[in-house]
Structure formats: C-alpha cells, structure tokens
A protein has these predicted regions:
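Conserved ABC ATPase signature
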Residues: 154-158, 162-164
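Helix-to-loop junction immediately C-terminal to a conserved catalytic motif
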Residues: 68
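Catalytic Walker B motif of ABC-type/P-loop ATPase nucleotide-binding domains
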Residues: 179-182
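Short coil-to-helix segment of the ABC ATPase nucleotide-binding domain corresponding to the Q-loop/switch region
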Residues: 112-121
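A short, proline-enriched helix->beta-strand linker immediately N-terminal to the Walker B motif
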Residues: 173-177
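Conserved ABC transporter NBD signature motif
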Residues: 76-84
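ABC ATPase NBD coupling module
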Residues: 85-101, 205
Length: 234
C-alpha cells in the first residue's frame, strides 16, 4: 500500500450473507449470499474527503460495513489502513477498528455516563493505561469538536448536534487515518448539519481521510468534494 493510501479496492464485489465471518468457505457465502455491489475500484488517500451518495438500499452502508469488517470481503482485492481485507480473521477485527474511526447516525453513546466517561471507558477498553495520557487525549478531542466545556454533561443533556460531536470525538481518540461516517447528519437540522460538515472538513485538513455516506445533496453543493454515486449495484 502506498504510504498515504488508506483504502484500496480493486474488482470488489460485496455480498450480504447471514454469517459473513463464520466457518463457511467464501465460495459458499458467495453462492448463498445476496450480491449488493460489483466491480468496485476505489482508492482514498490521507486527508481526502469523499461522499458516497445514492438511494436507500444502493449499497453505501454495505461498502462502509465492508471497510470496517462487519461484512467480509469475498471477491476482489481490498486493503484498509494496512489490513488486507481478504486475509482478515475475526481476531484481527478489533485491531483494524482501532485504526479507523466510525461514526453512526444513531450515536450509540453510553447513556448512564457523562461525556468524559464515554471517552475514558473507550480508551481503557482499547489499551490506554497511563492516566495522564488518557486525560490529555480526551482534552484534545473535546477541544477539536468544541465540547471542552461539556465534559461533565450527560448525553441526554446534549443537543443532537452535540451528541454527534461526542460520537466524532470518540471516533478520533486513537488518532485514526480514516474516518467512516454513515449518514451522520440524517437526524440533524440544516444549521447543525453544516456545523458537522465543517468539523469533518477540519478533520480532513489535519490528514485524516473522511468517507461519508449521505443522501443530502444540498450539503454536497455547499461543501463540494469528491463524490461517488451508487446506482444499479455499482
């Protein structure tokens, strides 16, 4: 993989199967799974901002799931942040995901813990041990997402936009080279969505590639970037 290339897909076909990382051979999964996308070639480099657009069911989310190994890559060549997706084992998946950031539309925050603990617990779970380093990194990401004065707040005390900023902060804790965002502005009003896009652009400018699925063409017009259209399984 080139030094600054974080995604490389060549001749990739993506299937949805009931047990994508089970014990069945790829040939059986291909035969019994549902073909979602075919003949995908894609390269993304550090610091690049890329939109994935298309109708619901066009395969945007399936591509993202393949990149963070929720779906197994069965056909074609694929590398993400140095990991070969065709050779990936179940035990490798946590290590892959520590090198990428993932932002979901539905937040998935720990509702019984405040902003600080939502981040602190993730860092402990991913191997951080030194207390001073943990607190320093939490301060850094909270400043980046403009939540430095909200660390004591509970998730229910935050607005929708602030909750999404917390999710982004969580995704950035391990300094990823790639951020994957699945419809991150889908539940937000236009002004708040603009703020999230500005934040993503700032993150990309710092060298982290951002790949974002969306159906909001107004955002793309206001914040133009490389755009990939998904239609008819491609």
């Amino acid at each position: 993989m080139n030094d600054n290339r974080v995604i490389r897909l060549k001749g990739v076909s993506i299937y949805h199967a009931d047990d994508p990382f089970g014990s069945y051979p790829p040939e059986r999964l291909v035969r019994e799974g549902e073909l979602i996308l075919s003949d995908i070639d894609l390269e993304v480099h550090e610091g690049e901002f890329v939109y994935l657009i298309g109708r619901v069911g066009s395969g945007k989310s399936s591509l993202l799931k393949t990149l963070y190994a929720e779906l197994q890559l069965l056909q074609g060549e694929g590398e993400v942040v140095g990991f070969d997706l065709r050779c990936l084992k179940r035990k490798d998946i946590p290590y892959l995901r520590r090198r990428i950031g993932i932002v979901f539309q539905d937040y998935q925050l720990l509702t019984d813990r405040n902003v600080f603990l939502n981040l602190y617990d993730v860092m402990r779970a991913t191997g951080w041990k030194e207390e001073a380093a943990i607190r320093k990194r939490i301060d850094e990401v909270l400043q980046l997402v403009q939540l430095e004065n909200k660390s004591y707040k509970m998730p229910f005390e935050l607005s929708g936009g602030e909750q999404q900023r917390l999710v982004i902060a969580r995704a950035l804790l391990n300094s990823p080279k790639l951020l994957l965002a699945d419809e991150p502005t889908g539940n937000l009003d236009p002004v708040t969505a603009d703020g999230i896009l500005e934040l993503f652009r700032e993150i990309a400018a710092l060298g982290c590639a951002v790949v974002m699925s969306t159906h909001n063409t107004a955002l793309i017009e206001e914040y133009p970037a490389r755009t990939l259209l998904f239609a008819r399984g491609r």
